[in-house]
């Protein structure tokens, strides 16, 4: 008699690959995947778990690429925006939309990413941009993420087309 996981239909080759519960086999693979998805839902409650898994896969590939080549994949902006979407619930605009990257509630949000390659922990944004919040995402060389959400009003006033935000200047 063939043992199959009742949840996935996959064949279990050995009794150690699953548990017998209420007259059915359930594979450890299914149980572990379920627990992983529950953990993701706790960490990113407003996000689609599949999108979060894609984000984690991208991080794994980027880290593996760095380990193999000594170089970083140049996907920082997309990683920052994706993190903003899954962690904060930013609803992103279509690609190449002018003015801001997305919305958080009623606020237009500009997302800027500080990569581990950047020489200084600062970003600049166009003063002409249509945003009321600036979300700065900082990524370490170990692919760990931290973020700060800043009101546009708190950016320093001044001449020029760009406003600057320095990570060390604030603990917000």
Language model regions located:
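Nucleic-acid endonuclease domains
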Residues: 1-172
